[in-house]
C-alpha cells in the first residue's frame, strides 16, 4: 500500500512536455512505426485509468477503516507497542461529546437496570412467600391424601369383615336348610363375596340400601346375629361418612387458604401504591404549609413595619411642633421684647429699653453662618467661653440648637472665635418661679445629652433602612454580625462621622440642627463656631433626640447621609416620653423604667422584641 502511494505514476501528453522535449515513440521518430506508437500510448492510458480507479477504491476503503479505527479507539482506547496511547487531536471535541452522550446513556441504562433489579427483588420476595405458602398447601394435601388412604384401607378391612360375616351367616343358613330339607327343596348355593367394590358402593350409597334385597335372607335368621351385623354395618357406614366429610372440609380449607393468599397479594400491592402516594401528598402538603407560613409571616412583618414608619413620622411631626412651641414660649419668657423683635444683631445694655445704648458690632466668624431666631449676643444664661465677649446682654436668650459665639458670664462652651464687642457684665434678671418652668426647661434639667446619644447608637430603624439613597455606603443589617445590634461605645467626635472623615463645623451642625418656623422678626444670623459641639451643653439635647428625623431640605439631608449610625425609632419614642415625665416606658410592651435605668439595658430590652419578631 505504501509503495503504491510512494510511486509517482503519471502519464503526460505531448503538449504537457514542452517544445524542446519530444516523444521517444512519436510518429516523427523514424526508428519506430506509427502503429506501435499508438498502441503503446493507448495501453499506457488504459493502465493509468485502471490504476487510478484502484487507487481511488483503496483510498475510500482506507478512509472507512480509519473512521472505524477512531470509533473503536474512542470506545476502547488502544496502547501502542511503545506504551503511548493514540490520540487524535482532530476529533477531541467530537470524542468528548460522544463520550458524554454514551456516559449519559449508560447512566440511564444503569439506573433503569437498578430499578428493574429492585423490582425483581421485590417480585422474588413475593414469589418466595407464594412458594412457601404453596409448599405448606402441598404438605397439607399430602397429609390429607395419607389420611384418605388410611381411611380407604380401613373401609376395605371392614368390608372384608362384613363379607366374612355374610359367608358365615350363609353357611349357618345352609345347615338349617339341610335340616329342613324334607320340608322344601334345597336352595341354590350363594356366590362367594369376591366383589368388594359392590359392597363399598352400597356403603357409600347410604343407608337406603336395605337388607331385604340380600340373597338368601330368610326369616329364620336369629334376631341377635342380625342386629349385630346391622350395627357393624352402620358403624362402617358412619366411619365412611366421617372420612368423606373430613375430605370435603380439608378441600374447602385448601380453597380458603388459596383465596386468602391471593387477597394478601392484592392488598400488599395496593398498600405499596397507596403508601407511595400518601408520602408524596404529605411532602407536597408540608412544603405548601411552609410556603404559606412564610408568606403570612412576611405579610405581618411588612404591615408592622408600615405601622412603625407611620408612627415614627407622626412622632417626628409632634416633636417638631412641640419644640417650636417650647422655643417660642421660652423666647417670650426669657428675652425682652426689644431684643426679640430686633432685625439686626445688637448689644443691649443693662439699662431699661427706653434708654438707647450704642450698638455693638456683630460677631464675626470665619465659617458660614445660619439664620437663628435669636441674635448672636450672649446672655447670662449661657456658658463661658475662652474667647473674649463680643456682645454681652443682660437678658436671657432663648435656647437654640446651635450655641452662639458671643461670650457671657453664664457657663458657655468654648469657642476659638475672637472677641468683637466686649461689654461689661450686667446683672442677670431673677429666674422665673418653679411653677412657671416650661416643658423644655424641665427637659434641660435631665442628665447630659452625651449619655443619651451614647446609649442610642444601636441598630438603625427599618424606616431608615428603607431609604437606600441615604445609606448607600452602609452595609445591610442582615450582613452584620450579631454584636452589631448592641450599642457601640464611640467617641463623641466619631458619632456622626467616620474615623477617616474631617469633622467640619458646618457639617457637624447641619446634620443635627432643628428647623423652626421663621418668624417675621427673626432675621438675625447665628455664628457657627469652628469647634465641635460639646456634649455638656444643654442646647444639644434638642438635637440629640431630633437627629433621627429626616430633614427635608438638601443641605441637612446631605449631612444626614454622612452619618454612620442613625438613632432608631425606640430611642425617639423613649426620649419624647422622658420630656414630660420622670418615667420611661418600652414602646412595644409598655413596661415602665425609671429615669436612672441604664440606657444600654433598655436598648437590649427593645432589641429582644425586635429579634423575636424576625422570621
From Swiss-Prot:
Zinc finger (UBZ1-type): 583-609
Tissue specificity of this protein: Detected in leukocytes, lung, placenta, small intestine, liver, kidney, spleen, muscle, heart, brain and at low levels in thymus.
Region called Disordered, residue ranges: 326-458
Record GO biological process: defense response to virus; type I interferon-mediated signaling pathway
Region entry Interaction with TBK1 and IKBKE, spans: 280-329
Single annotated GO MF: zinc ion binding
Residue numbers bearing the Phosphoserine modification: 184, 365, 372, 379, 385, 400, 415, 504, 534
Annotated Zn(2+) binding sites: 586, 589, 605, 609
Pfam hit, one: TBD
Residue ranges, annotated region (Homodimerization): 1-279
Composition skew (Pro residues), residue ranges: 345-365, 389-406, 416-435
Name this polypeptide is given: TANK-binding kinase 1-binding protein 1
Lineage: Eukaryota, Metazoa, Chordata, Craniata, Vertebrata
Complex and partners: Homodimer. May form a heterodimer with NAP1. Interacts with TKB1 and IKBKE. Weakly interacts with DDX3X. (Microbial infection) Interacts with vaccinia virus protein C6.
Coiled-coil residue windows: 48-162, 221-276
Function: Adapter protein which constitutively binds TBK1 and IKBKE playing a role in antiviral innate immunity.
Keyword terms of this UniProt record: Coiled coil, Host-virus interaction, Immunity, Innate immunity, Metal-binding, Phosphoprotein, Zinc, Zinc-finger
Any GO CC annotation of this UniProt entry: serine/threonine protein kinase complex
Signal peptide: none
